[in-house]
Amino acid sequence: VRDNLRTIIVVVAALIFMRLAQEILAGEAVKLDSWAYELVVVYMRRPWLTPVMQSISELALPVVLIVMLLAVEAFAPGRRPAICAGVNLVLVLVLNVVLKQIVHRPRPEGFRLIAETGYSFPSGHSMIAMAFYGLLAWMVWHYERDRFVKYLCMSGFTLVVVAVGLSRIYLGVHYATDVLAGFCVSLMWLGLYTKIFVPLFLPDGTDPQAVDRKPEVSSPSSRAG
């Protein structure tokens, strides 16, 4: 069932991404971008909301991600969970650079609230957020036994991903199609990464919290008793 769901997600994400890329490369105007501009840029922007969106956008910056990696290592003794998340992050960054160089889509002009450089498609922040926090959600789903903690963490990670994507549109540094494409690419990537690469770090059925944990040695008194 898990493999079937993974396949469906990957295929749907691939179809959406290919459609978006086709339209962008053909120079066609996408209605989604116009709708998102009207909704997010025209109607949502408020002086008090702008610093909030800037802070949300920073959840995909290196300093925050490094802190998150340290947290993964702290809460999951043994380095493999943190290394797993770190390798995922590095490979996604490389993939984003490659895709941007292929598409060469300029960033939006005229309504940016912050300065950004580089190409626009797909959104790097959106790709990073989906790949990194998405993998953390996957880890929690597979290895956390407490249902409340599991659903709380997964809801939190999902909210972060959506909020980061929305913040990039709000700040005027990406089109909605950049964000959607970034999400789709990372969903495809996570389907591959969790199937092929994650087992190298976290074998199926292994609790990350138990990785490299030494077995308890009973005391002489307990053996005598």
What do the PLM-derived regions correspond to, one by one?
Residues 16-20, 91-98, 159-168:
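Aromatic-anchored segments of alpha-helical transmembrane domains
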Residues 3-12, 69-93:
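Interfacial segments of alpha-helical transmembrane regions
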Residues 17, 21, 49, 95, ...:
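Alpha-helical membrane-inserting segments
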Residues 83-113:
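Hydrophobic alpha-helical transmembrane segments of integral membrane proteins
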Residues 1-63, 101-113:
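N-terminal transmembrane-helix/juxtamembrane module of multi-pass inner/ER membrane proteins
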Residues 44-56, 88, 92, 112-117, ...:
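Short juxtamembrane and helix-loop transition motifs at transmembrane-helix boundaries
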Residues 69, 112-225:
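Membrane-embedded catalytic cores of phosphoryl/pyrophosphoryl-handling enzymes
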Residues 57-77, 132-134, 140:
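Hydrophobic alpha-helical transmembrane segments
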